[in-house]
Amino acid sequence: MPWTGIFSLSAVTKKKMKTGSQKAVWGRGYMKIAYKAFRPDLSCQAGGSTYQYQLQKWNEIKEAKCRETGFHCAEDPLDCLSYYPVWEQAVYYMVAADGDIDEDACDSKIACTRLRLLKKMTKEAYIYVALVYMVQHPTRNWNANVKRERAVADRNQMAVSRGKNPAAKGGLGAVLGLAKETPDGCGITDIAVCVVDGKRYLPDVFYDVNGNEVLI
């Protein structure tokens, strides 16, 4: 399934089912699929010191408590940007969180004692899974990177717009995410991911969730 395009909720459901199968394969007990940002060499702070994460294995630590100890990740991909806000200076992964798990009461952060890196995320994939998170949890607090109705991204950056009639624009190379809500509630009816390529999607032009130009 491509990461860019106009998505029906049936497609989102299929993607959710695929993620669920990963839980069955990788999990040992109460496991969650989440997202984590790292330095380019896959190192990150863990328990007050720098930890070097490894691919293709379970990384393990003794204790997990949010904001204090353990490996930290987030259910909402966009929460990772609070800690590593510059895409070009970090790498972002889908991860499996397992072992002892502690969840934060403030945002979607998770602390765990076992963590496995599953998939490195492109910008397009990252915005897509962020939109899927909104579909699955429409009433949860919005990440600060999600803008109501209108969002704007600089060249090669990202923007996410959510609302009754969301629209977004960006410079060349920007990735735009859109989530349309129900007329009388906060549930999500449609999502879209668009890359400003200078051909199908033009720089500094607002687009709606159907990929159509919007005059604002």
Please name every model-derived segment.
Residues 2-216:
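Short, glycine-biased loop/turn motifs at secondary-structure junctions and
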